[in-house]
């Protein structure tokens, strides 16, 4: 299991699979995530489903880590275990899509704070320049 921040800190090539249903995926998902509904994935990865496993193995390389995104992090944990048993480096995103939304909101706030801090710095510089001009 990994946090959203750990996913973004991982600079390697990776695959993000959103295992929520298509409607939710279409509303919003993580950048570069592909959709693969969890029930379909579970069925494809069953031991007795040779064609499903083959399809998965041909689509997703074991050389690239797979991050799994569900609503809350529970269903993706099950799939994480299955993929690890198959030899994949797989991670469930802790807290799922809810955690992603919280992380995204926090990033917006940080960006806004940085912009405001830069505006204040620029304003202080302007004041300093005007003071210097007056007393030259």
Regions found by a protein language model. Give the residues of each.
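Short, surface-exposed ligand- or partner-binding patches at beta-edge/loop junctions that are enriched
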Residues: 68-69
